[in-house]
Structures are given as structure tokens and as C-alpha cells.
């Protein structure tokens, strides 16, 4: 019988600690080995028994969660799932959590927290189980000076995508390529590593990164400050063009569209697709319909299977498709599913993706 995943819960709220314990221990594969009201108690608990996963609040007495997260990753890396009542004004804090090494962030409301956690039981257990298998990587410090240079019921994307339009114009070959990237758990820092390595005049890039609403704007701002390419949160109608990276806003789907030789994005509401909004499948399938062989599809680290079928559609439409390899994926879920479907032309490690983007995008 496989060993249970051992979890340490760190939260200053006694009721949250109790509710989280009940939720996690309802899964037969998870065991809560302890709880702590603050990082100091947590540190002593870790010395007694090292957990497989830590769930961590951010706002706590004596030491904030981000400081504790940085100490964990510097001294004894352990997969950490941040579970906190962050609001849109705390979006920079969320960025700091991902930068410090958090595997995932679960948002809990400031009121009705216990009920929310109970309703999110399956998601929370899935995230913790994915975190237990995460490959923690030491990422290079952000900054221009030292970055590498390169010359629920699951709906399909049909619920969001418009019916296909007859005619050959949408599939006609143009001189410009569009790079479509999908990522989830572990993607924030992996994307940073890829985008930092690209020069300003790189091919156009559109990205779906699973992330809560309002946090994508801060994520885009952070990347824009680090990268030579322009990085922005997409708004409806934004032009897709060389030198620009568009990131789908949280809680909205992003579709690639085409008018003549011009590509642009449509940002829209819609149901959850593959349990996500934005959905990688929605972006990839729209790229298959409107870009065809002009597109390059890349599926990166993340749990679940969002994007796998969409990548297969891109490949069938003539796009060049890539899956990140297992060794460099924080969570080898989405790429694994895509590879199993035969959706990937090539499987590459993270450090080779920037070079391949330039090669494929300029072909």
C-alpha cells in the first residue's frame, strides 16, 4: 500500500486549521501530520518530522508567510501550497509567493472561509497531491544582468469557441508565426525563465497560465519589467504582433482570431473548460482554426489535462507542437497527457524552449 502524503497545515485561524484537516484527511491518500498557528511553531514541527507538502497562509503573526516560504526554499525545499485570503490589492504578494517557490495558490474568501473550503474539497486535495510530486527547481535570480541570452463536469472548448467558418483564408500561410503557450502549476517561474531569454523582436506570443482573476495583471507587469519583449495582460481586440506577449486575464477565456493578415485576441466570458477559465484548450483550438500552420503550440508544466486535446488539434491543423519534458516540469500532468495523445512533434527541456521558439517562429 503506498505511503500517504504527509501534510503540515500552517494558518493562524484555528477554524481553518480544523476545516483543512477534515478536508485533507477525507482523502485516503493524505495524512495531516500536524498544524501550526505561525511559522515559528511550524519550523519546530518540521524539525520533528518533515512533511511532503505544507499548506501555508500568508497573513500570520510573528512572521509573514512569504518570509517563511523563502526560508523553507533556501534551507530545506518542501512543496508549498499557499492557501490565503489574498485580494486583488494583494496581487503583488501572490507574485512574490510564486517567485519564492510556491507550487500553487488557493484563494480563500475573507468571509465564509470554512464553507468555501468544504465546497472546494476535491480541488484542494488534487492540488496537494500534485504538489507532493512536484519537482522543486532552483530558479536563477530575476534580473537583466544575469539572465541567459539566446541569439467540475468537464466541458470541451466547443462550449466557448464559435462554429468553424468555411473558407481557406483563415488557414492561409502568412509570413508571421504565432507562439501559443499553455501552463499551469509551476508555470509562473518557468514562463519567466523562457521569456527572459527572448530578445525584443521575438515572434508574437499568446499565453494561458492558470491563475486567479486580477493576479494576471500583476504577473504580466512583473514579466514586462524583466523581459525585453512587451508583456501585458490581454484585453479584447489586442493585436498579436512580433515583440509582444499577451497573457490571458484570470477568469476569462482568450481566443486567437484573424482578420486578413492580422491576428488579434478575443477575451470573453464562458463556462469552465477542462475545469479552467482561462482554458488552454480554448486558446489552442482557436489557434488551430485561425492560424493552422502559422502557429506553434507549446504545452508546459501543470497538473491535469487542459490543453492536451487542443494541442492535438493544432498539430492536425499543421502547427508545430512542443511538450515540456518530465525532468524539467514541476508537475508532469498536462505535457504527459499531450504526449500520450500523440499531440507533440517534439519533447524538450525547459532550457531549450526559448531557442526553439526563435527557431520555429522565424522559420
Swiss-Prot record:
One Pfam family in the UniProt entry: Response_reg
Keyword Electron transport: no
GO CC annotation, single: cytoplasm
InterPro entries found in the cross-reference section: CheB-like (IPR008248), CheB_C (IPR035909), CheY-like_superfamily (IPR011006), Sig_transdc_resp-reg_Me-estase (IPR000673), Sig_transdc_resp-reg_receiver (IPR001789)
Stretches assigned to the CheB-type methylesterase domain: 172-363
Keyword Magnesium: no
Entry keywords, A to Z: Chemotaxis, Cytoplasm, Hydrolase, Phosphoprotein
Reaction equation(s) it catalyzes: [protein]-L-glutamate 5-O-methyl ester + H2O = L-glutamyl-[protein] + methanol + H(+); L-glutaminyl-[protein] + H2O = L-glutamyl-[protein] + NH4(+)
Enzyme class: hydrolase
Cellular compartments annotated: Cytoplasm
PTM per Swiss-Prot/TrEMBL: Phosphorylated by CheA. Phosphorylation of the N-terminal regulatory domain activates the methylesterase activity.
EC numbers for this chain: 3.1.1.61, 3.5.1.44
GO BP terms: chemotaxis
Described purpose of this protein according to its UniProt entry: Involved in chemotaxis. Part of a chemotaxis signal transduction system that modulates chemotaxis in response to various stimuli. Catalyzes the demethylation of specific methylglutamate residues introduced into the chemoreceptors (methyl-accepting chemotaxis proteins or MCP) by CheR. Also mediates the irreversible deamidation of specific glutamine residues to glutamic acid.
UniProt domain comment: Contains a C-terminal catalytic domain, and an N-terminal region which modulates catalytic activity.
The protein's name in its UniProt record: Protein-glutamate methylesterase/protein-glutamine glutaminase 2
Annotated source species: Rhodospirillum rubrum (strain ATCC 11170 / ATH 1.1.1 / DSM 467 / LMG 4362 / NCIMB 8255 / S1)
Gene for this chain: cheB2
Amino acid at each position: 500500500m503506498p505511503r500517504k502524503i504527509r501534510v503540515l497545515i500552517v494558518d493562524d485561524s484555528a477554524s481553518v486549521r480544523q476545516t483543512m484537516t477534515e478536508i485533507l484527511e477525507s482523502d485516503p491518500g493524505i495524512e495531516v501530520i500536524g498544524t501550526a498557528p505561525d511559522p515559528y511553531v511550524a519550523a519546530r514541527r518540521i524539525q520533528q518530522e518533515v512533511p511532503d507538502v505544507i499548506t501555508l497562509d500568508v497573513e500570520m503573526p510573528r512572521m509573514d508567510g512569504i518570509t517563511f516560504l523563502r526560508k523553507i526554499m533556501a534551507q530545506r525545499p518542501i512543496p508549498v501550497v499557499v492557501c490565503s485570503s489574498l485580494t486583488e490589492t494583494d496581487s503583488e504578494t501572490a507574485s512574490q509567493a510564486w517567485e519564492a517557490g510556491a507550487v500553487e495558490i488557493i484563494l480563500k474568501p475573507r468571509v465564509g472561509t470554512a464553507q468555501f473550503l468544504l465546497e472546494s474539497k476535491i480541488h484542494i486535495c488534487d492540488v496537494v497531491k500534485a504538489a507532493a510530486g512536484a519537482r522543486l527547481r532552483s530558479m536563477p535570480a530575476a534580473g537583466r544582468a544575469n539572465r541567459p541570452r539566446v541569439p467540475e463536469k468537464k466541458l470541451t472548448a466547443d462550449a466557448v469557441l464559435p462554429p468553424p467558418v468555411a473558407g481557406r483564408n483563415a488557414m492561409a500561410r502568412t509570413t508571421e508565426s504565432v507562439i501559443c503557450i499553455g501552463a499551469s502549476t509551476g508555470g509562473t517561474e518557468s514562463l519567466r525563465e523562457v521569456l527572459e531569454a527572448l530578445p525584443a523582436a521575438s515572434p508574437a506570443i499568446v499565453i494561458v497560465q492558470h491563475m486567479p482573476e486580477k493576479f494576471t495583471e500583476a504577473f504580466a507587469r512583473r514579466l514586462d519589467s524583466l523581459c525585453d519583449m512587451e508583456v501585458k495582460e490581454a484585453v479584447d481586440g489586442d493585436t498579436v504582433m512580433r515583440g509582444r506577449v499577451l497573457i490571458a486575464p484570470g477568469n476569462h477565456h482568450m481566443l486567437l482570431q484573424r482578420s486578413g493578415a492580422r491576428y488579434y485576441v478575443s477575451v470573453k466570458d464562458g463556462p469552465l473548460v477542462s475545469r479552467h477559465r482561462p482554458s488552454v484548450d480554448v486558446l489552442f483550438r482557436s489557434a488551430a482554426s485561425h492560424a493552422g500552420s502559422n502557429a506553434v503550440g507549446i504545452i508546459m508544466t501543470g497538473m491535469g489535462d487542459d490543453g492536451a486535446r487542443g494541442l492535438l488539434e493544432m498539430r492536425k491543423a499543421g502547427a508545430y507542437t512542443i511538450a515540456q519534458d518530465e525532468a524539467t516540469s514541476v508537475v508532469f500532468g498536462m505535457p504527459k497527457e499531450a504526449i500520450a495523445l500523440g499531440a507533440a512533434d517534439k519533447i524538450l527541456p525547459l532550457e531549450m524552449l526559448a531557442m526553439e521558439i526563435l527557431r520555429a517562429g522565424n522559420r
